Amino acid sequence: MTGSFTGTWTALVVSLRVLPFAARVWILAGTAALVVALALLAPPVLQDEGYHDFAPTALFGVPDFGIVASNGAFLVVGVWGLWRIGFRRIAPWPFRSPGEHWPYLIFFLGVVLVALGSTYYHAGYHAGYRAGPSSETLLWDRLAMTVVFMALLAAFIGDRIHLGVGVAVALPLLLGLGALSMAAWHVTGDLRLYHLLQALPILLILMICLLFPDGLTRFKYAAWMAFWFGLATFCDLFDDTVYGWIGFGGHAIKHVLAAIACFMILAMLEDAGRRTETTPAPGPSP
């Protein structure tokens, strides 16, 4: 069974990658355009103010301790990634071109900002200096999340499609689009663009892995990342249900699962370093 699946999967990937480069780019762009069109046709998504009422995560007698402390998972992964890449601690250094590592640095910086933004959103009430979680403070949490998703998409574009396009063009444009999604929410109250910028990058990253040859990135890590992000989203959407199952709120668990998803990218880069050691001059796989 496993051998049959592997053979079918390999045949699918090969059949896609033998298409002309322009055709593969059009497949990717067409998919993105279709998803964007469907999002625009959907009704506006407004922020439910009840969203801020999270299931209990009390620990050590402190209300909502878990939902705040779980942001430490983001902080650990983000700082670890910044240290490993920013100080070139991945050895051998897997990046072959100047600037190739910048999307990953911004990705892990975004993860740190998520830890800070989410803590600010959740913890202020318990520190006694504001009225509690609100859409106004949630904006900073979500803005940081757009940095994470946009930088990651730019990294995969740069690795598998074109380095210059990924780093010099896609990265600033996508980061700007993420900021625009928050401005749109602030002005119109509509969250469609924000939700689109969470879901679409994951879909496009998986498609990029199928359509274009391997570089530093690997499909298995992207798939695991998507899995953990998907599980995190489930726990967030069914916060109270998860609490009913295990006596602990799903939103706090979401933080930990999403941090694991981010760690998959660091694991992928560490693996790329090991491959660089065993193969001094790697090239894209056929």
Each model region followed by its residue ranges:
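N-terminal hydrophobic targeting signals that begin at the initiator methionine
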Residues: 1-2
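A generic alpha-helix propensity feature with a strong bias for hydrophobic helices
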Residues: 59, 204, 283-285
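Short, highly charged, low-complexity non-transmembrane loops/tails of multi-pass membrane proteins
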Residues: 276-286
